[in-house]
């Protein structure tokens, strides 16, 4: 089978054009609002305050890599939410009964200056939260 020079040029141009299209599959929301996500996680229970510590930088120069850490001594699960992102549900950390520590650290993307929420489900079934405001100078979610 012979391939003409014209076909090669057309295929090459098509490939280059396709690579320039914005593909934000990971930053797309599945349509759930933050309230729905919280209600699903808590089962509609009240959220109090208590022994949970969310650590974030006050100012993030680059929203693509914002370091966070969260700790709660009696947590079985901790959900992180970034309400200013297209998809506010960032991550859920789960801890088993043999977990030595109930803490986690990661880097997240933040689209703009916003509040970051950490909601912990405790061993007794209650929920507590901590909120930190992060000022973002360069957004990280394609917005």
Regions found by a protein language model. Name each.
Residues 133-139:
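Short beta-strand edge segments in extracellular beta-sheet folds
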Residues 27-59, 89-93:
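Transition segment at domain starts
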Residues 72-76:
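Short proline/glycine-enriched turn/loop motifs at strand-loop junctions of beta-rich domains
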Residues 86-109:
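An anionic, turn-rich surface loop/hairpin at beta-sheet edges
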Residues 111-115:
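Extracellular Ig-like/FN3 beta-sandwich strand-entry sites
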Residues 1-16:
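N-terminal secretory signal peptides and thylakoid transit peptides that target proteins
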Residues 64-68:
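Structural beta-strand segments of beta-rich domains
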């Amino acid at each position: 089978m012979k391939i003409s020079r014209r076909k090669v040029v057309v295929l090459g141009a098509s490939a280059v054009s396709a690579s320039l299209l914005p593909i934000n599959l990971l930053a797309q929301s599945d349509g759930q609002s933050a309230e729905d996500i919280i209600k699903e996680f808590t089962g509609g229970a009240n959220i109090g305050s208590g022994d949970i510590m969310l650590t974030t930088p006050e100012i993030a120069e680059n929203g693509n890599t914002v370091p966070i850490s969260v700790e709660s001594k009696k947590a079985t699960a901790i959900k992180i939410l970034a309400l200013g992102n297209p998809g506010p549900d960032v991550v859920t950390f789960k801890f088993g009964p043999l977990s030595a520590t109930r803490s986690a650290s990661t880097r997240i993307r933040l689209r703009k200056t916003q509040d970051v929420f950490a909601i912990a489900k405790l061993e007794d079934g209650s929920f507590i939260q901590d909120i930190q405001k992060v000022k973002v100078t360069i957004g990280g979610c394609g917005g």
